[in-house]
């Protein structure tokens, strides 16, 4: 039997970062972090992350850290950093492996990101995930419970921390190996693969809180704002060449219609087939001078033009033409406004794929203008569906995966109780919806109530996406969509 400290050190050495001769050195470096008291307890635990958690508790008892989630996270990341190679070494390993098998190189990097607890697999497992059948196919729903809530002690401690602008944001290269602090996540065990996209250096990493399989983030090595241009399409298509089986997409570059981080240019990708990818063409056509590119409108709640070609450059040129036209295009009949004075309202959310040697680019048209009636955005979730989703509709939602806030776990349970006629604490903003459900399901029972509420939450998400779609799925909406397509030029 081994002591807990020796058990940890042996596991570290198994990962190949250190040799047997380094054993005493590694042990002493760990003791420096956690203190010496309590490390002689016997442990036969095999899971490295579990051993790490025990060591963090020892450090707490030894007064090395305070009883704050953030301090525990910082120390935990520092301990798991023992199994992760230096960035230079990891990049050498990745690209050497890539030369033999790109898929294997990616799988190894993904595994290391999970093994080192950079990807928070235990926290992600808390998420509630379900699917809902809609007229657009099966949509995916996640109630996000993975990110820890701040407790009052943390909030109080944050007020005492001096402001700093290092790293500038969560997507900067400077996060690699960053210790973390009370108001900033621990990144000691974080590594980034460098890759060239055209003439720029970018980083490839995974999201610590995955929303889907192999959820990757690609970030510009420079802290520059989001910008959708011809270069965006070029880089997305390059990523799907570099990483076989991955899609790559970008949030839009304007507020309301984009993601939560507009200050740092980045893309997302991964190995997941989203509901939108499964959606078929509603109508097909050929753009003028691009007869070799398959094109059409996708049967989807948002307004999507899909382009397909084996010729990447032709796809790139046509996508750029569509983007440039959309930037300046207005159609007041359907409340589509490209510009208010000097403020632009039009952009796109692009998604690239490569399937069986053929490139595919989905161009989702976005408009972020507001009115008195819709102060949050004309093409933003409207007031009557904000009880389920009021946040911006970014890339992941666009593709058919709802990321819903933690509040919905208890709130949907209360909706279920309300439908059953039981004592409940239903939130006021769910009442109108719940009454509609009561009318729709007058004889609902306990066995089915949960699946009914989940199914109906999925229908609300479909409506959320319809709200964000600039052209509605009506005859007049389709007619207006075709007016734009014709303005680009079709045969």
UniProtKB/Swiss-Prot annotation:
Q: Does the keyword Cell division apply?
A: no
Lipid metabolism recorded as keyword: no
EC main group: transferase
Gene Ontology terms: cellular component: cytoplasm
Q: In which pathway does it act?
A: Carbohydrate metabolism; galactose metabolism
A single MF term (Gene Ontology) = UDP-glucose:hexose-1-phosphate uridylyltransferase activity
**Which reaction does this chain catalyze?**
alpha-D-galactose 1-phosphate + UDP-alpha-D-glucose = alpha-D-glucose 1-phosphate + UDP-alpha-D-galactose
Q: Any idea which UniProt keywords this protein has?
A: Carbohydrate metabolism, Cytoplasm, Galactose metabolism, Nucleotidyltransferase, Transferase
The family assignment reads:
Belongs to the galactose-1-phosphate uridylyltransferase type 2 family.
Protein name in UniProt: Galactose-1-phosphate uridylyltransferase 1
Top-down, what is the taxonomic lineage of the species of origin? Bacteria, Bacillati, Bacillota, Bacilli, Lactobacillales
């Amino acid at each position: 039997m081994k002591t807990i400290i020796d058990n940890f050190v042996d596991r570290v050495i198994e990962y190949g970062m250190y040799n047997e001769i380094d054993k005493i050195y590694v042990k002493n470096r760990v003791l420096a972090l956690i203190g010496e008291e309590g490390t002689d307890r016997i442990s036969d635990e095999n899971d490295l992350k579990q051993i790490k958690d025990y060591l963090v508790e020892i450090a707490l008892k030894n007064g090395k850290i305070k009883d704050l989630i953030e301090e525990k996270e910082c120390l935990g990341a520092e301990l798991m950093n023992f199994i992760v190679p230096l960035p230079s070494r990891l990049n050498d390993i990745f690209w050497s492996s890539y030369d033999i098998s790109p898929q294997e190189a990616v799988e190894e990097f993904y595994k290391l990101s999970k093994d080192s607890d950079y990807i928070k697999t235990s926290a992600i497992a808390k998420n509630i995930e379900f699917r809902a059948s809609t007229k657009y196919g099966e949509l995916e729903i996640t109630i996000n419970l993975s990110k820890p809530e701040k407790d009052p002690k943390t909030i109080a401690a944050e007020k005492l921390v001096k402001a700093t602008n290092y790293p500038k944001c969560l997507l900067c290269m400077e996060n690699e190996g960053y210790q973390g602090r009370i108001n900033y996540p621990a990144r000691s065990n974080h590594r980034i693969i460098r890759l060239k996209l055209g003439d720029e250096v970018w980083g490839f990493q995974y999201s610590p809180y995955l929303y889907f399989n192999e959820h990757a983030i690609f970030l510009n090595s420079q802290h520059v704002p989001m910008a959708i241009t011809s270069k965006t399409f070029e880089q997305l298509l390059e990523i799907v060449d570099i990483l076989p089986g991955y899609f790559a997409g970008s949030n839009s570059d304007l507020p309301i219609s984009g993601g939560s981080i507009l200050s740092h240019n980045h893309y997302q990708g991964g190995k997941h087939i989203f509901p939108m990818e499964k959606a078929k063409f509603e109508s097909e056509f050929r753009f003028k001078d691009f007869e070799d590119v398959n094109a059409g409108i996708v049967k989807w709640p948002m307004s999507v033009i899909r382009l397909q070609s084996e010729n990447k450059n032709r796809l790139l040129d046509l996508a750029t033409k569509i983007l440039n036209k959309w930037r300046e295009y207005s159609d007041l009949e359907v409340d589509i406004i490209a510009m208010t004075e000097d403020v632009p309202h039009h952009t796109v959310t692009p998604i690239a794929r490569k399937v069986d040697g053929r490139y595919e680019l989905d161009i989702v048209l976005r408009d972020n203008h507001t009115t008195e009636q819709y102060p949050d955005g004309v093409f933003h979730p409207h007031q009557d569906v904000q009880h389920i989703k009021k946040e911006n509709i970014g890339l992941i939602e666009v593709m058919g995966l709802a990321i819903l806030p933690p509040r919905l776990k208890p709130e949907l349970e209360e909706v279920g109780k309300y439908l059953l006629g039981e004592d409940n604490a239903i939130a006021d903003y769910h009442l109108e919806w719940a009454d509609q459900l009561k009318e729709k399901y007058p004889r609902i029972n306990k066995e089915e109530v949960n699946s009914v509420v989940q199914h109906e939450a999925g229908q609300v998400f479909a409506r959320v996406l319809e709200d964000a779609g600039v052209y509605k799925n009506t005859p007049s909406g389709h007619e207006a969509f075709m007016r734009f397509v014709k303005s680009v030029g079709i045969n």
